Amino acid sequence: MEKGMDVLHDFGIQSTHYLQVNYQDSQDWFILVSVIADLRNAFYVLFPIWFHLREAVGIKLLWVAVIGDWLNLVFKWILFGQRPYWWVMDTDYYSNTSVPLIKQFPVTCETGPGSPSGHAMGTAGVYYVMVTSTLSIFRGRKRPTYRFRCLNILLWLGFWAVQLNVCLSRIYLAAHFPHQVVAGVLSGIAVAETFRHIQSIYNASLKKYFLITFFLFSFAIGFYLLLKGLGVDLLWTLEKARRWCERPEWVHIDTTPFASLLKNVGTLFGLGVTLNSSMYRESCKGKLSKWFPFRLSCIVVSLILLHLFDSLKPPSQTELIFYTLSFCKSAAVPLASVSLIPYCLARVFDQPDKKSL
């Protein structure tokens, strides 16, 4: 088994080396793709856009992103996947030959296990939701037309082009092996397809959100403690990252498994509180909710404020404080974009009507 994995890992190293040698001019492009594919953009950019255009799509997108990333964490703890940038330095596979030279980049040194790829899984799930939802909107109940078939082909070509670029980016940056990105894409699609058949997420109560959030958090912590009690160190990758990363400043605490867990449960809890709040009902369910200028204003203001909010980084000196603030920050994203911003804008748009009276 170990020899088979070594051969698979060697193929990945050779793939990374080939891309880095033959596509040096594409370095900036691959880094940009990796940054855009970060799941944070689903929360801070795609969610507010889709929520205010099609509320149901926005809700499904957030659920797929959160549950997909949570499953990714569990899979990583089970599969113990290596990462190219440390495996190539740590393995005995090249004891009789020269070690392939693999470059590292500021976005290379993630601290969690490598399989499956979180970037590939998150991008596949989120973009699958957007493509299938867009096709569903344009198709409606009518018989498919020639234009719809063309749109269908274009969207799926775009979808697979995005997945290919994300996969190549993660391989180029030595963050993942090829089999890990393929597993990520397939897993992301599976999660998104599952949520196409789940309708209860659109009218879930605050109690249900709380119970699901509690389950996700307690299961992950319980699973971690169980394996730790059995002598399995699930934080083994932190030592690998700190040891083999080219520059210490490239190792970020916000890429650790627990940081991912707190962000996910915080986002889902924030969505539950928001969708069951009076501010949401007064603004997003009020008379202005169907007025396009109002919805467009909500999108623009949300994107601007969330961009500024995202630039605020929790202090990372103390892990407990960092994780707590990460939870609060993630919960504030849906709270701001779904209830607070629309509520304030609704008050602004209502002012002229009140003055005319």
UniProtKB/Swiss-Prot annotation:
Keyword Endoplasmic reticulum: yes
Record topology, Lumenal segments: 1-28, 82-117, 169-170, 231-254, 313-320
One matching Pfam family: PAP2
Pathway: Carbohydrate biosynthesis; gluconeogenesis
Residues binding substrate, per UniProt: R83, R170
GO MF entry, a single one: glucose-6-phosphatase activity
Glycosylation sites (chain numbering): N96
Intrachain S-S bonds: none
Reactions that this protein is recorded to catalyse: D-glucose 6-phosphate + H2O = D-glucose + phosphate
EC number: 3.1.3.9
GO cellular component: endoplasmic reticulum membrane; membrane
UniProt keyword annotation of Iron-sulfur present: no
UniProt motif (Prevents secretion from ER) ranges: 354-357
Keywords attached to this entry: Disease variant, Endoplasmic reticulum, Gluconeogenesis, Glycoprotein, Hydrolase, Membrane, Transmembrane, Transmembrane helix
Topological domain ranges for the Cytoplasmic compartment: 50-60, 139-147, 192-209, 276-291, 342-357
GO biological process, one term: gluconeogenesis
Active site: H119, H176
UniProt xrefs under SUPFAM superfamilies: Acid phosphatase/Vanadium-dependent haloperoxidase
First and last residue of the signal peptide: none
Localization (cell): Endoplasmic reticulum membrane
Mode of membrane association: Multi-pass membrane protein
The protein's role, per its UniProt record: Hydrolyzes glucose-6-phosphate to glucose in the endoplasmic reticulum. Forms with the glucose-6-phosphate transporter (SLC37A4/G6PT) the complex responsible for glucose production in the terminal step of glycogenolysis and gluconeogenesis. Hence, it is the key enzyme in homeostatic regulation of blood glucose levels.
UniProt similarity note: Belongs to the glucose-6-phosphatase family.
Disease: Defects in G6PC1 are the cause of glycogen storage disease Ia (GSD-Ia); also known as von Gierke disease. GSD-Ia is characterized by hypoglycemia and hepatomegaly.
Name of the featured protein: Glucose-6-phosphatase catalytic subunit 1
UniProt organism field: Canis lupus familiaris (Dog)
Gene: G6PC1
